[in-house]
């Protein structure tokens, strides 16, 4: 990869020459309503600290704001607040509905877009669309409450209220540019899109996270220097200054709870909402001495119709000398040009401008979604100066007292999901590796570190329930990162791989001991991240008739995990030959798991099995007593076994310095020929290659016949999570006198299961599609050009598996691409987004997508795993121009070179 100015900054950060990552977009979009801030008796996090309290109540564990930044430990924070003269409160944070208020669960209602960002955050840009009329808080709450009774009704969005009619809104753009690691220029540009002049109050705000109200930590201080600068003093942080030339006034209060407003008790004279009350109501709630722990610079201006207002600030070390420094506009332009060069070097030549825009905004969303996550479970359970409610010691996450989270983590969505999710994070790292290998490696290992991983080896799922089980993707993601680094730099980071394998061993041991309840290598799994894809709530522990559910995907994930561990050990064995023994161990473990896929057939005398020979699909099986009931739901669960695959070059292994692994496979082939035949075959493009897989050639063809059928799983925009066939033919089953069923819902969920904001019963989900694409390429590497399938089924077009993978990638990318009419499928029927050029190209990366038309659904800023579209665009560009960039993901890698971290 070309060494751009941004690459040089990454090198400086890696080698300790400059701490470029010290400041970044680590402020959450929402801290209220989180588990961390919940001290209620019943664990009702959304109600304990609601949006209406957020402006008045000091947070215990983090901060939030609009387009904000903080230092790595979130000691000092900066964000933008605004007022249009009509809202009942300042716009200090984005507004959205809680899980109970939204008709499909929690839902942010403000419109904001992450447009640009670099991995050192030397350049960042985001856009917020602020209505000029009074923000319709009551209308959004009331209408969505009315619609909640019928989940088939669409969500009532901000644009539906009419607040943007006549273009009466401001486009507010925040730009950040770093001169040095601790010298940051901030430009705020307000564009009046309306037909009339309109007032705006801008209040860029600097404050300290409250660390002093809960214990003995000393209280920091902000104060005014003259009329255009705010200075900081903190016992543990370097002194900083915020220069605000041209501000009308500097306003100060304390980041402390307004106990008088909330509980009628005496409290601070200038509380957290003091600036809000002063601006909106004229209250005497700002400190006339111009000092405190929260401060804002005020600009009150009239912006003419079609006109713009721009202000520039500078956050820098107290020793910087003050002012904006030399040529602030030139610095902004330079950092933008450097960002252009950085991203141009990461896309193959020939990538269309539209795809380049999509990829860049996807990367921007990934980088903006870094968040400081603070949660010390022991302290949280015990409470602070005020004792927590009784019974808390046995409440949520009480078995995870060792967790001491105080890290910057890539979030799924910093408003709807402002907490880590273990399997989401794995997908994030695959995208992050394209821009920041060091950060990606740290992130993929993070939840397996001792301050997160349970002593028994379990990885925490997410703050609502650390005990839940997510698919074990950490080693897969780590291998993706290592392969990408080796392909693009020629280095194999064996130090990273050793850490990955060591932590993975602990997790694998927990997985097989905990989730294999009967010791037969069939895995119950539980939740496994696919929310409502099952007929039953798999995380509840309840099954009809007190039965046991044998999950096709649970066993698949276990086999997948074993293969990833085997491949990691094989990579390390290139430089540490003793790892061949570990690789052989995981090969054998995979074989036993694969054999268990047929275990039910033996135990039930052929009456049930995970593989259904007649349908050519895998199904979950429910056992109640001596009865085995296949749950014939045609879903991603049916297809997932194809992802457990590895293609081995036996000739290369035999020719290596330590051919022990090849010898072990040869022994296994001789001694356990029947079992070996189930999982491994050499029928392909070369006899020296061995395919290790849960599915043989025949089963793969049959699975693909369903997966690539437009009447079943194949949409114009990727693979559906549930077959379209279930629209006309819903699955029904009766067990113990109770009826259960599942139907095709291509859009939002029609039930309240898992809060109602997630749906795996029809929509397209980017992460599992990417796993399927990856598996197709690995199968192709073995079978080669001779293995073709009809794609789509019924078209008469025959494709190799590599071509099918490219076709699926194109369909997923097409969700975001503008057609000849300029319309983007992601926007669905939203007229303003489809027709207004100012809205059409500022993209949102939704959680999942309509199974028929590709419209975005769910969390609007889940760039996390949906950011994988950037990887797909890169891969498609390399496929179209194989000579223009490093080899594709599965080409033969260069020789290993040990690399430290």
Feature annotation, model-predicted:
Residues 1-56, 74-76, 83-901:
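Acidic, mature catalytic/reactive cores of soluble proteins
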Residues 65-70, 78-81:
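Structured, charged N-terminal subsegments at the starts of enzyme catalytic cores
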């Amino acid at each position: 990869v070309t060494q751009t100015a941004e690459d040089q900054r990454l090198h400086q950060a890696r080698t300790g020459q400059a701490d470029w990552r010290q400041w970044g977009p680590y402020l959450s979009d929402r801290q209220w309503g989180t588990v961390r801030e919940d001290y209620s008796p019943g664990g009702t996090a959304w109600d304990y600290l609601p949006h209406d309290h957020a402006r008045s109540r000091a947070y215990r564990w983090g901060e939030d704001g609009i387009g904000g930044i903080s230092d790595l430990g979130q000691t000092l924070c900066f964000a933008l607040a605004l007022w249009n003269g009509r809202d009942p409160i300042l716009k200090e944070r984005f507004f959205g509905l809680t899980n109970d208020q939204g008709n499909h669960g929690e839902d942010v209602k403000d419109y904001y877009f992450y447009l640009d960002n670099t991995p050192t955050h030397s350049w960042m840009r985001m856009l917020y669309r602020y209505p000029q009329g009074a923000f319709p808080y009551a209308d959004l709450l009331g209408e969505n409450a009315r619609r909640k009774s019928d989940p088939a009704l669409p969500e009532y969005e901000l644009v539906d209220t009419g607040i943007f009619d006549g273009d009466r809104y401001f486009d507010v753009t925040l730009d950040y540019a770093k001169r040095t690691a601790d010298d940051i220029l901030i430009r705020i540009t307000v564009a009046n899109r309306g037909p009339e002049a309109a007032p705006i109050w801008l209040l860029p705000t600097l404050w300290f996270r409250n660390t002093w109200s809960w214990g003995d930590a000393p209280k920091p201080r902000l104060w005014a220097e003259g009329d255009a600068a705010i200075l900081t003093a903190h016992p543990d942080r370097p002194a900083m200054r915020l220069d605000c030339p041209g501000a009308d006034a500097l306003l100060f209060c304390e980041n402390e709870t307004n106990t008088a407003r909330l509980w009628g008790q005496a409290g601070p004279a200038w509380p957290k909402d003091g600036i809000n009350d002063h601006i909106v109501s004229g209250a005497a709630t700002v400190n006339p001495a111009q000092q405190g722990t929260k401060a804002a610079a005020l600009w009150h201006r009239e912006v003419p119709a079609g006109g713009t207002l721009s202000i520039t600030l500078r956050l820098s070390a107290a020793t910087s000398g003050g002012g904006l420094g030399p040529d602030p506009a030139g610095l902004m332009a330079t950092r933008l040009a450097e960002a252009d060069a950085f991203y141009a070097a990461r896309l193959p030549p020939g990538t269309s401008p539209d795809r380049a825009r999509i990829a860049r905004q996807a990367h921007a969303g990934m980088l903006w979604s870094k968040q400081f996550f603070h949660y010390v479970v022991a302290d949280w359970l015990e409470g602070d100066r005020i004792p927590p409610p009784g019974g808390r010691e046995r409440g949520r996450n009480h078995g995870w007292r060792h967790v001491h989270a105080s890290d910057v983590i890539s979030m799924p969505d910093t408003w709807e999901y402002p907490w880590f999710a273990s399997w989401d994070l794995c997908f994030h790292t695959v995208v992050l590796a394209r821009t920041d290998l060091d950060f990606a490696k740290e992130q993929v290992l993070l939840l397996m570190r001792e301050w997160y991983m349970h002593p028994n080896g379990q990885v925490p799922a997410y703050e609502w329930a650390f005990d839940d089980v997510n698919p074990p993707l950490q080693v897969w993601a780590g291998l993706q990162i290592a392969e990408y680094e080796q392909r693009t730099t020629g280095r194999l980071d064996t130090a990273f791989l050793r850490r990955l394998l060591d932590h993975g061993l602990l997790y694998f041991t927990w997985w097989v001991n905990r989730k294999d309840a009967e010791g037969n290598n069939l895995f119950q799994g539980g939740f496994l991240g696919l929310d409502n894809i099952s007929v039953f709530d798999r995380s509840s522990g309840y099954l009809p008739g007190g039965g046991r559910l044998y999950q096709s995907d649970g066993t698949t994930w276990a086999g997948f995990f074993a293969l990833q561990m085997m491949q990691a050990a094989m990579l390390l064995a290139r430089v540490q030959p003793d790892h061949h023994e570990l690789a052989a161990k995981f090969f054998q473990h995979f074989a036993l798991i694969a054999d268990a896929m047929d275990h039910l057939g033996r135990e039930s005398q052929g009456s049930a099995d995970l593989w259904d020979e007649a349908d050519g699909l895998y199904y979950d099986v429910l056992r109640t007593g001596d009865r085995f009931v296949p749950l014939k739901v045609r879903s991603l669960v049916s297809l997932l076994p194809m992802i457990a695959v590895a293609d081995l070059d036996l000739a290369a292994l035999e020719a290596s310095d330590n051919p022990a692994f090849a010898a072990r496979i040869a022994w296994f082939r001789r001694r356990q020929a029947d079992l070996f035949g189930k999982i491994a075959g050499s029928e392909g493009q070369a006899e020296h290659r061995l395919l290790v897989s849960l599915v043989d050639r025949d089963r793969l063809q049959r699975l693909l016949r369903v997966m690539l059928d437009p009447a079943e799983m194949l949409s114009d925009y990727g693979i559906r999570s549930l077959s379209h066939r279930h629209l006309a033919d819903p699955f029904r089953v009766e067990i113990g006198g109770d009826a259960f069923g599942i139907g095709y819902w291509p859009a939002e969920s029609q039930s309240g299961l898992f809060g109602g904001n997630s749906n795996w019963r029809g929509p397209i989900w980017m992460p599992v599609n990417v796993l399927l694409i990856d598996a197709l390429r690995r199968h192709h590497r073995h079978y080669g050009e001779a293995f073709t399938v009809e794609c789509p089924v019924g078209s008469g077009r025959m494709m190799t598996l590599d071509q099918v993978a490219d076709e699926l990638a194109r369909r997923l990318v097409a969700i975001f691409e503008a057609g000849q009419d300029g319309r983007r499928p992601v926007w669905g029927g939203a007229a303003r987004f489809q027709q207004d050029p100012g809205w059409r190209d500022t993209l949102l990366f939704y959680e999942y997508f309509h199974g028929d038309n590709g419209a975005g659904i769910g969390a609007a800023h889940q760039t996390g795993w949906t950011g994988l579209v950037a990887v797909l665009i890169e891969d498609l560009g390399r496929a179209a121009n194989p000579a223009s960039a490093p080899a594709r993901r599965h080409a033969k890698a260069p020789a290993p070179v040990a690399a430290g971290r």
